[in-house]
């Protein structure tokens, strides 16, 4: 996400320092925040940000795959999940297994791009779940409330930025934010 730690220049405008480069980011700050807050990079407040991977599907209902259809503005729902082939579960590293209160962010699809929900383990009777390649998992550090990030990303101003940053001929994929 664009959000970065700015510093103020002599002109009282916000600047971002990235390595050796410093640039004015006044046009990128979506809205004013209280003086006691600061803009930060999403990577600075999360321990994991990763798109899911393409699964090998199976009719065996053992390990659900969280897809965009499981991720609605009304919340997370396991009922629409498909399942991965049980023999492929070992190809997933432990951090790819969903954890309670992970943010599920639809990262492709016209009309679904940017949609977000919060994963709840109590809504998954199967125990283990993984995300497919159209869902990005955002796992905030313990000091950050996932609900705060959810409401930030759900904000119409931020959703507009996400739509404007979409990529490809059909504007169906988020290349980057920021």
Regions found by a protein language model. Give the residues of each.
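Short, basic/aromatic beta-hairpin or loop at an interaction surface
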Residues: 70-84, 127-129
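Non-catalytic DNA-recognition/assembly elements of restriction-modification systems
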Residues: 23-52
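Short beta-strand/loop turn elements enriched in aromatics
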Residues: 57-77
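Active-site/binding-pocket entry motifs
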Residues: 71-72, 110, 159
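Extended, domain-scale alpha-helical bundle/helix-rich regions
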Residues: 1-22
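Amphipathic alpha-helical segments
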Residues: 37-38, 149, 178
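A short beta-sheet element
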Residues: 67, 89, 93-154, 168
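Specificity-determining recognition surfaces
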Residues: 152-178
């Amino acid at each position: 996400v664009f959000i970065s730690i700015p510093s103020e220049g002599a002109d009282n405008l916000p600047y971002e320092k990235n390595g050796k480069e410093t640039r004015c980011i006044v046009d990128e700050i979506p809205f004013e925040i209280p003086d006691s807050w600061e803009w930060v990079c999403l990577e600075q407040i999360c321990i994991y940000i990763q798109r899911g991977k393409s699964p090998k599907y199976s009719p065996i209902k053992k390990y659900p795959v969280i897809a965009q259809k499981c991720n609605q503005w009304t919340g997370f729902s396991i009922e629409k999940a498909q399942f991965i082939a049980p023999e492929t579960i070992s190809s997933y590293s432990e951090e790819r297994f969903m954890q309670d209160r992970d943010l599920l962010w639809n990262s492709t699809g016209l009309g679904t791009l940017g949609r977000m929900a919060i994963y709840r383990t109590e809504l998954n009777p199967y125990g283990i779940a993984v995300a497919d390649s159209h869902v990005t998992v955002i796992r905030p550090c313990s000091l950050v409330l996932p609900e705060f990030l959810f409401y930030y990303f759900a904000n119409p101003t931020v959703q507009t930025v996400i739509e404007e940053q979409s990529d490809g001929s059909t504007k169906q994929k988020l290349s980057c934010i920021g």
